[in-house]
Regions:
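Repeated loop/turn-to-beta-strand initiation elements of outer-membrane beta-barrel proteins
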Residues: 71-74, 108-113, 160-167, 197-205, ...
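Outer-membrane beta-barrel translocator/receptor signature
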Residues: 29-30, 39-48, 52-98
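Transmembrane beta-barrel strands of outer-membrane/channel proteins
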Residues: 48-52, 78-80, 113-121, 169-175, ...
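Flexible loop and strand-edge segments within Gram-negative outer membrane beta-barrel domains
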Residues: 84-99, 114-164, 172-184
Length: 356
């Protein structure tokens, strides 16, 4: 190929002129704009319900707390109801109670204490007092009263923490005294803790116990303690939690199932669930007298077992404050106490324990 001639590039030069022009500029004055404050929602801190019915029955129910409860809450609750009938001698009743409560919110933990006093009085009913002589049934033999003094301290976390831990617990004490000389002291406690892993898995355990000491006329001391380990999985709209509830009741060991399964079909509005829960229910005067206050002094107190089997259920909440819960299942009781008239005094009841 022929050799091409290479020419040197032509030299080029440029002349750039620079000119500066000063222009005065005054920005518009910045004025702060205030957004209109929204009126805070008024929250009631005083509640009072009062009424009056036939048989000279006054009803009072009240509650009062401090107005700003963001950091702490202190309050007082009370209730009272009684009846007074002229034509039915000694067949009236009275129920009253007052509770002082307080709780304090730390950064992520809430602690609180309740102190209460209850006085309930019941007169025997269901008989015609005109058929019996006054010497047999007088005012002192036709009523029974219950006085309860108790307190409860509790704690729980109400905010998320770096370790994804949830925990809560309580310790309670109740002293019950009857006007026939019987008394009962109850101590109960529970502690629950759980941890979440990878926003899917949950593992935890709960320990709880109850100690009942009854003087009637001898001494009857009973202690129940339970331990419940559990684990769960949560994936989208489905959640399942299962474990075992192991209970020691006066030296006897019982193992119950613990299973909760739910499917959130429509968030908060339609939830399908089924459950299988078992436990030992404490049977004492404190838990029984509100169902039947006429309890014999000759009762042999014993606890009973329960199993709540919910085969299928639907629950949810609808706008407007309406909620529903419909389920199909069965309750299974073992050693269930049934009230039976005492043969020595028809005004009192003892127990017949049904095996199943």
């Amino acid at each position: 190929m022929p050799k091409l001639k290479q020419d040197d590039p032509t030299k080029q030069s440029y002349t750039v002129s620079e000119k500066s022009i000063e222009i005065g500029y005054k920005p518009a004055e910045i004025k702060p704009l205030k957004v209109k404050d929204e009126e805070p929602e008024p929250l009631p801190f005083v509640y009072l319900k009062a009424g009056f019915g036939n048989y000279l029955t006054p009803v009072i129910d009240f509650s009062i707390t401090n107005k700003n409860t963001e950091k702490f809450k202190v309050g007082l609750q009370g209730d009272f109801i009684s009846s007074k009938r002229k034509n039915y001698a000694f067949q009236d009743y009275l129920e009253s109670g007052v509770k002082l409560f307080g709780q304090y919110n730390f950064k992520k933990v809430l602690i609180g204490t309740d102190v209460k006093f209850n006085f309930d009085k019941y007169n025997f009913y269901g008989y015609d007092h005109l058929l019996f002589p006054e010497e047999l049934f007088d005012k002192d033999t036709m009523d029974i009263s219950y006085r309860t003094i108790g307190f409860k301290s509790y704690f729980s976390n109400y905010a998320d923490n770096s370790k994804d831990l949830k925990y809560k617990g309580h310790l309670g004490f109740n002293q019950l005294k009857l006007n026939d000389g019987r008394s009962e002291n109850i101590i109960d406690f529970s502690v629950l803790a759980s941890k979440k892993f990878k926003d899917i898995f949950t593992a935890g355990a709960q320990i709880s116990g109850n100690s009942t000491s009854l003087k009637s006329p001898g001494v009857n001391n009973r202690f129940v303690v339970g331990f419940k380990p559990f684990a769960g999985v949560e994936m989208g709209i489905w959640r399942i939690e299962g474990g075992a509830n192991v209970v020691i009741d006066e030296g006897d060991v019982f193992a119950f199932p613990y299973l909760k399964n739910q499917l959130e079909i429509v968030p908060t509005k339609l939830v399908m669930y089924n459950e299988w829960l078992g436990d030992v229910s404490v049977n004492n005067i404190f838990n029984t007298y509100t169902k039947n206050p006429w309890l014999s002094q000759n009762i042999m107190w014993d606890n009973y077992k329960t199993e709540d089997r919910r085969f299928i259920g639907l629950r949810g909440a609808i706008t407007g404050g309406f909620s529903y819960d419909v389920s199909f299942g069965q309750m299974v009781y073992k050693n269930m106490p049934l009230f039976v008239n005492d043969t020595t005094d028809f005004r009192k009841f003892t127990f017949n324990y049904e095996e199943k």
